[in-house]
Amino acid sequence: MLELDLQRASQQPAPSDEQFRQWCELALRQRTADSELTIRLVDEAEGRELNHTWRHKDYATNVLSFPADVPDELLDIPLLGDLVICIAVVEREAAEQGKELQAHWAHLVIHGCLHLLGYDHIDDDEAEEMEALERTLLAELGHPDPYADDES
């Protein structure tokens, strides 16, 4: 079972709680243990502040992943971590990249969840593995390959 804490810290419209749950459960289905996850939806100011604090980048980014660092045995429900998603950046990227907004949301939530599971894209081999899984999961939702334009 997934315990999802969805925090809407921005007044901007965003997908429904049910959609976030669907995307998270899809990305996390390989994990058999119960899990707890927080997603915080923020405005650009908070997104920029968090990105500056944690990554030393002075701009808001689409999604930040904060894996939990607490041993599972110390918790009633294992804590995967937190995702922080900047609504304005998601909307802007979708428009600039010509992507359907819902597909971009799904991609970023899945991408963030995979980071919480330990996937990364620092080197090419890791990136290929992570992107292949993202493509597969998004295809199950009927969404196009989010990296198709990157390869042309």
UniProtKB/Swiss-Prot annotation:
Cofactor(s) listed in the protein's UniProt record: Zn(2+)
NCBIfam families: rRNA maturation RNase YbeY
EC number from the UniProt entry: 3.1.-.-
GO CC annotation, single: cytoplasm
InterPro entries: MetalPrtase_cat_dom_sf_prd, YbeY, YbeY_CS
Chain positions recorded as Zn(2+) binding sites: 111, 115, 121
Identification of the protein by name: Endoribonuclease YbeY
Known function: Single strand-specific metallo-endoribonuclease involved in late-stage 70S ribosome quality control and in maturation of the 3' terminus of the 16S rRNA.
The family this protein is said to belong to: Belongs to the endoribonuclease YbeY family.
This protein's UniProt keywords: Cytoplasm, Endonuclease, Hydrolase, Metal-binding, Nuclease, Ribosome biogenesis, rRNA processing, Zinc
Entries under SUPFAM superfamilies matching the protein: Metalloproteases ('zincins'), catalytic domain
Cofactor descriptive note: Binds 1 zinc ion.
GO biological process, one term: rRNA processing
Subcellular location: Cytoplasm
One Pfam family in the UniProt entry: YbeY
PANTHER family found in the cross-reference section: ENDORIBONUCLEASE YBEY, CHLOROPLASTIC
GO molecular function: metalloendopeptidase activity; RNA endonuclease activity; zinc ion binding
Group of enzyme by EC: hydrolase
